[in-house]
Structures are given as C-alpha cells and as structure tokens.
C-alpha cells in the first residue's frame, strides 16, 4: 500500500519503482488508469472494503489513499480498453456505493497509461477532473479527464487574469447573483463546449437570443 501511495505522489526514483515492483510482483508494463472516489465525507472504511470486494490485487487492481476523503483505485485494463469501458467501471462504483452503503460518491478518472512509472500522471489527471467537475459539471457523479473540455482550460487560468477579464466585460455590473435561467444557460453552454448552435437547439431558443 505504501508503494502505491509513494508512486502516486511521485516520491520514488525510477530505479526504486522497478526494484520494489519486482519484489511485490507488480507488472511494470500494463495499461492502467487511476480512479479517484470522493466520499464527500471523511473517508469511511466501508468504501475501501467495498472496493476490495469489487477489485482484487490478483487481477492487477490496487486500492490506496493519499488523503482523508478520497479512495484511489489503480485499475489494470485490457489493451483494447475504450473510454466507454472506463465509464462503465466508474458507473459501477457509483452504483455499488449507493446500493450497498447508501453513499453518494463522485468518481473521476485519468487517461490510460502503459508504464507503472506513469501512474502518477493518471492520478493527477483524475484529481484535476474531480476539482474541475465540482465547478463546471456539478451534476455529474462520473467525470473523465479527457472530456473536461473548456472547463479545464478556464480552471487552469490564473485568478488575476480571470478577474481582469470579468472586469473588462462587465465593468461595475458584476454578475454576482445570477438567476436560475441564466445559470442553466451558462451550464448548458459549457456542456456543449461553447457550441452556440447545439446549445440553442437544446434550450429551444434562437442562436441570436442565446
């Protein structure tokens, strides 16, 4: 467990990764993705236990944690894995936590990596997906790094740059309190990656009105 903890946090030298993986009989080369399960409460052991019942180290899957609210699944995958396969894993976790423990969890996952040393990259992507998802896709309980779209770009902009942009656009009339209709429109706009035509179609309004 400590090995994967340090691996995710980039606290191991490359030679140490290979040496410890050999001792622990962990495959160095295999397609893997990191799934981050947020319990929204302080981490409960039941989440870890349920995950251990669903995924086993014999199948190349490993469960660990790096903080108090998130549990991490490092899942070994087939070479022909697809984005939809990853979504199925995430949706299964959400459904199981809800059915077995009545827990409302959010699951984020990173991209597939082929080398053990790159697992930390998938973890960082999953963590970013979780953070961005809370802001731009709050209604989703499954968030993929590869589908963050414009939300990821905006999230990574410096705060000062965002503040200057807002002041230039709105002047003194900052939109602090937005009505529900406006918020719905904005969220739908982001959902469609700023595609005006598709957003106006889904909201049943003319594109000029939008």
Regions found by a protein language model. Give the residues of each.
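Cytosolic nucleotide-utilizing catalytic cores of signal-transduction proteins
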Residues: 2, 6-209
């Amino acid at each position: 467990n400590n090995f994967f903890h340090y691996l995710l946090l980039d606290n191991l030298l490359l030679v140490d990764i290979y040496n410890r993986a050999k001792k622990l009989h962990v495959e160095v080369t295999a397609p893997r993705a990191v799934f981050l399960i947020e319990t929204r409460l302080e981490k409960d052991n039941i989440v870890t236990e349920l995950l251990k019942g669903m995924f086993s180290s014999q199948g190349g899957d490993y469960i660990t944690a790096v903080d108090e609210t998130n549990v991490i699944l490092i899942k070994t995958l087939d070479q022909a894995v697809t984005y939809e396969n990853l979504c199925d894993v995430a949706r299964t976790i959400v459904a199981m936590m809800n059915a077995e423990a009545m827990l409302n969890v959010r699951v984020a996952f990173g991209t597939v990596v082929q080398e053990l040393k790159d697992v930390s990259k998938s973890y960082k992507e999953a963590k970013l997906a979780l953070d961005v998802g809370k802001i731009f896709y709050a209604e989703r309980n499954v968030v993929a790094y590869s589908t963050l779209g414009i939300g990821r770009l905006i999230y990574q902009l410096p705060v000062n740059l965002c503040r200057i942009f807002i002041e230039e656009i709105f002047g003194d009339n900052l939109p602090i309190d937005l009505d529900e209709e406006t918020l719905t429109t904005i969220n739908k706009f982001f959902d469609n990656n700023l595609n005006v035509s598709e957003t106006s179609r889904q909201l049943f309004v003319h594109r000029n009105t939008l």
